[in-house]
């Protein structure tokens, strides 16, 4: 019989947090399999390299179960580098570089500060502090501030040459209260303030639009996919609904005070080595918001950002077949696949200046070869937006929606 469960050897992580993770009833006999399962649960929290355990003699003929997790040798201040590159080998070439820093275990309750900077086609800054409310607590507070700068072009009809270049700038700050579901996801609710602007880069006239408001927001994120790039199991859901109390700006009263964005994906196994990833996205921004569509797997065959508007609907079926067994000499996963995509963006503040160019549904398809390399996934994609354009595009990085 086990009389006590202990956690030993920790320097940074709070032992009480680990104990709160362990689901073992010491009133009943504890088997080696139960202890091993508890060790796996501790490891799955992501704080340790390994979680060895042992049984030691206890009082009155009992035993003491001792977990001795091995803290990460790199510590809990992590710096990560990423990004993406997209090129059609002609006029459409974009890149983004992402640098993120996470500083964990800043206090006994497991406070974590995350900062992210992105440079390139889209410029972005994010800073948030995740503070659990208690040792091993699932409730948390999270102050958050973000800024994003994103360009978009204005096209007329079927022309591939933009008649104007613009950018959106959005600043947002808020405080959120949420609940964490272990190894599943989180939900949160909060309030804050945002400021959004559209500015002209090049156009026949200098157009400027602004909007700002306080808001309340409900957000949810769940992710059980077994792989970030080529999943076979699990699901992904990310959604938010935001109500703006009193939007003020240069456009006048908005059509709606509600903003939302929903993204979802689920892989379906079609065979031992073949998977269909079904995904979709729907969104409505503020009157001074903007979504871009065009580029790899986002109406393939069209230039990056070919279509824009403040309303978006998009669906995609992405099939990939693992051919690594027939190409073992490359020593990395190789996939052959194809996609079918359908989407539309509409109701753009700028496009309405010359008439909405983004209303029709557009369909696209692609064939591609991909590899999940140690530098990240790489794709060579032959795409076609039906009735519009075609392209051969190289893409490196995690897929964007």
Regions found by a protein language model. Name each.
Residues 3-8, 23-29, 85-88, 113-116, ...:
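Second-shell loop/turn segments in exported
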Residues 32-33, 37-41, 47-225, 296-300, ...:
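Gram-negative/organellar outer-membrane beta-barrel architecture
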Residues 8-16, 25-36, 92, 120:
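Soluble non-cytosolic domains of exported or imported proteins
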Residues 1-25, 183-186:
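Acidic, glycine-rich low-complexity/disordered segments
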Residues 78-88, 204-206, 213-342, 346-348, ...:
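C-terminal outer-membrane beta-barrel translocator/porin domains of Gram-negative envelope proteins
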Residues 8, 21-27, 38-45, 104:
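Structured segments of extracytoplasmic/periplasmic soluble domains
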Residues 11, 60, 271, 371-375:
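A generic beta-sheet turn/junction motif
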């Amino acid at each position: 019989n086990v009389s006590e469960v202990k956690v030993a050897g920790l320097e940074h992580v709070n032992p009480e947090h680990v104990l709160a993770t362990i689901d073992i009833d010491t009133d009943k006999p504890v088997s080696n399999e139960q202890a091993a399962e508890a060790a796996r649960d501790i490891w799955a929290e992501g704080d340790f390299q390994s979680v060895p355990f042992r049984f030691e003699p206890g009082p009155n003929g009992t035993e003491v179960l001792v977990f001795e997790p091995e803290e990460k040798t790199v510590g809990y201040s992590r710096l990560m580098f990423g990004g993406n590159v997209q090129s059609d080998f002609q006029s459409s070439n974009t890149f983004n570089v992402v640098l993120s820093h996470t500083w964990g275990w800043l206090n006994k309750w497991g406070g974590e500060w995350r900062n992210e900077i992105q440079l390139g086609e889209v410029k972005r800054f994010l800073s948030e502090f995740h503070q659990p409310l208690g040792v091993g607590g699932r409730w948390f507070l999270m102050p958050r501030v973000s800024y994003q700068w994103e360009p978009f072009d204005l096209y007329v009809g079927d022309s591939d040459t933009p008649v104007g270049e613009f950018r959106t700038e959005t600043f947002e700050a808020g405080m959120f209260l949420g609940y964490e579901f272990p190894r599943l996801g989180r939900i949160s609710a909060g309030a804050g303030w945002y400021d959004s602007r559209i500015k002209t880069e090049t156009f026949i006239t200098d157009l400027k639009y602004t909007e700002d408001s306080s808001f309340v927001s409900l957000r949810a994120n769940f992710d059980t996919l077994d792989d970030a790039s080529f999943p076979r199991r699990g699901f992904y859901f990310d959604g938010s609904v935001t109500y703006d109390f009193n939007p003020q700006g240069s456009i006048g009263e908005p059509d709606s005070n509600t903003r939302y964005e929903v993204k979802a994906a689920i892989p379906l196994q079609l065979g031992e080595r073949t998977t269909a990833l079904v995904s979709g996205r729907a969104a409505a921004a503020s009157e001074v918001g903007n979504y871009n569509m065009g580029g790899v797997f986002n109406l393939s065959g069209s230039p990056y950002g070919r279509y824009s508007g403040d309303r978006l609907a998009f669906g995609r079926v992405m099939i990939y077949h693992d051919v690594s067994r027939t190409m073992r000499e490359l020593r990395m996963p190789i996939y052959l696949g194809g996609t079918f995509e359908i989407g539309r963006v509409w109701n753009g503040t700028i496009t309405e200046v010359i008439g909405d160019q983004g209303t029709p549904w557009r369909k696209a398809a692609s064939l591609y070869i991909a590899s999940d390399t140690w530098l990240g996934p790489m794709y060579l994609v032959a795409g076609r937006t039906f009735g519009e354009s075609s392209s051969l595009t190289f893409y490196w990085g995690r897929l964007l929606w």
